[in-house]
Amino acid sequence: MRTTILRALAMAGALATAASLPSPAAAAPVKYSAHYGEDRAEIEDLMARYLFAIDYFDWDAYVATFADDGELEFASGVSRGHDAIRKAVTDFSKGIGRFYHTADGKPAKLRHIILQSAIRVEGGHAWARSQWLEMANHGEGDQPKIGTYGEYEDTLKRVNGHWLFARRNVLNEFIPKRNSGPADPVAAMDAEAARVVGGKR
C-alpha cells in the first residue's frame, strides 16, 4: 500500500514538473532520406554490439564501436581514443563487484538492455538518444533486479562506410549531475543536428 502511494505521489510530481516547463516551439517535421532505414539498422546493430561487448567483457569489440578519435563520457570521466576508452572501461569493470554481487559475495552477472531510440541521420553524421537499463542477479536469492537506468546521448559518424560512435555520453538517473534533466532529450538532439547541418550550408 505504501509503495503504491509513493508511486502515485512520484507520478503526480513528475506531471506537475512537466506542466511547469515552458512549451517548446513546434519542431519542424524530420525528413528521412531514402537510406534512413538502412542507416538506422546499422546504428541499432552498433548499439547492440556495444552492449554485448560490455556484458561479455569483449573489450576489443567494445572499443571497435568507437571511431579512432572517439570519446566516451560516463561517471568515471571523459576518455578519448581507443587506448584511453579501453583503460576506463576495464578499470570500471574490475570494481563492479563492489556494487553488484550475489549472496555468496561473487560478482553478479550484469546484463544491459537498450529500450527505445530516436535516431537522426544527416549525410555522414548521425545523432541518437536512447534509454537503457542495467539488470543483475543481485536481488534476494540471486534473483534478477534492476540496478540502474539512464540515457545514452550519441553522436556518430560514418568512417570507411561504417557507422561508429564519435561520442557517447552515458547518463545515469541515480547519479547527481549525471541525470538527463527535465527537458525532452529528443528535442535537444534535433536542435543540435539542425545547428550542425545549418552550419555546413
Task: Outline where the language-model segments fall.
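Short, low-complexity N-terminal intrinsically disordered segments enriched in polar/charged residues
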Residues: A25-T65, R80
